[in-house]
Amino acid sequence: MGISEEIKLEELPQEAKLAHPDAVVLVDRAPGSSAASAGAALTVSMSVSGGAPSGASGASGGTNSPVSDGNSDCEADEYAPKRKQRRYRTTFTSFQLEELEKAFSRTHYPDVFTREELAMKIGLTEARIQVWFQNRRAKWRKQEKVGPQSHPYNPYLPGGAATMQTVVGAALPPNPFTHLGFQLRKPFDAQHAANLAAFRYPHLSAAPMIPSGYFNQFQRAPPHMLPHGMAGMYSPSSSFQSLLANMTAVPRGTPLGKPPALLVGSPDLHSPNHMLASPPTSPASGHASQHQQHPTAHPPPPQAPPQMPVGVQPAQLSPQHLVGIALTQQASSLSPTQTSPVALTLSHSPQRQLPPPSHQAPPPPPRAATPPEDRRTSSIAALRLKAREHELKLELLRQNGHGNDVVS
């Protein structure tokens, strides 16, 4: 079969020979005599079928070279796809990483001399160091784009409370990463960093950022009851209980010192915790509003057991409360910040406070209508009273400094 196929290939036209150049070349190189050897026939048959003969070196690798010679092996190796050698990941030791980070803190783009020196120092190739710096710069750009809050050396983490206080303070450095050697390409605004920290962690930055936090410390208890240094050590609930105890004890011994406790100490009842307190503490705020409104009405409140001793002596408390109301009107007229709430509460409270001086003997009639009204307006009137009392306290502290000197 191989010999007959060889004869047919010789008789093919020129177009067929061009279509099968390998076969033609192999046939031409085959012995020309009719008595072809079996090996030549096998070569021709395999070349026609597309296979690579074992004895033909020109067709190795499937190349279509028209001439097969000794150089065909080199050409086949050049065109053959070369397999890339696999390189495993480089494992850096802690010493190498430390030295690389130090170099990166000095500069993000080290020159070739620096890389070679570092390579000799830590035992790596210069190419590995160059690739590490490329990856490190990419990581740094990503962290810079996301923001400082995701940085591994984050000064805004909740765990670093001491660092948080220094960052939020006035002595904030322009770049919080300067102590680590990191240079930012963009200018870092200190005020922006403080605002960002205050926005993300208000529980850590409320006291240093808000100046009114210092006033909140002195709202815990009246100034004549606690020294200024210990005012911030009392919680709202404990100061409220101590205020009630002092209010029940002070009027019996020194009734003249009682009105300042009402006027100056009452802002303790309107801290934000008491405004948004749970239902057990909301009646206390209602009693506080009643306690501010009934000093001139003088009868003891029927539903407030802690405040019963406050109004036991209506004849003694009425003049001082009138003086306190006059001071309240004077202080509210001096404070321009909250004119509308003060005007509303002043126009609302003197209507109840003016009639009692004419009929101090029968206290029950005006007191009968007050508790329902206090209960109805506890959500709005109490807030207005608290705002007015806060302004009054600030004004009294600004003028006198102590609540004992207000009435005297």
Curated annotation (Swiss-Prot):
Q: Which InterPro entries match?
A: HD, Homeobox_CS, Homeodomain-like_sf, HTH_motif, OAR_dom, Paired_Homeobox_TFs
Q: Where is the composition biased (Low complexity)?
A: 287-296
Q: Which domain of life is it from?
A: Eukaryota
For bias kind Polar residues, which ranges apply? 331-352
Q: Where are the transmembrane segments?
A: none
Tissue-wise expression: Expressed during embryonic development, in distinct epidermal patterns in head, thorax and abdomen and in an endodermal pattern in the anterior intestinal tract.
Q: Where is this region: Disordered?
A: 50-82, 258-313, 331-379
DNA-binding region located at which positions? 85-144
Chain positions of motif OAR: 378-391
Pfam families per the UniProt record, alphabetical? Homeodomain, OAR
GO terms (molecular function) for this protein are: DNA-binding transcription factor activity, RNA polymerase II-specific; RNA polymerase II transcription regulatory region sequence-specific DNA binding
Q: Which GO terms describe its biological process?
A: antennal morphogenesis; chaeta development; elongation of arista core; imaginal disc-derived leg morphogenesis; leg disc development; negative regulation of DNA-templated transcription; regulation of transcription by RNA polymerase II
The compartments listed are:
Nucleus
Q: Where is the composition biased (Pro residues)?
A: 297-308, 353-369
What keywords tag this UniProt record?
Developmental protein, DNA-binding, Homeobox, Nucleus
Q: Which GO terms describe its cellular component?
A: nucleus; protein-containing complex
Effect of loss of the gene = Flies display a reduction in size of the arista and scutellum, a reduction or complete absence of the tarsal claws, irregularities of the sternopleural bristles and of the wing vein, and a bending of the wing blade.
Function in brief:
Involved in the morphogenesis of proximal and distal pattern elements in a subset of appendages. Also has a role in early imaginal disk development.
Q: Which family does it belong to?
A: Belongs to the paired homeobox family.
The name on file for this protein is Homeobox protein aristaless
**Which species does this protein come from?**
Drosophila melanogaster
Q: Which gene encodes it?
A: al
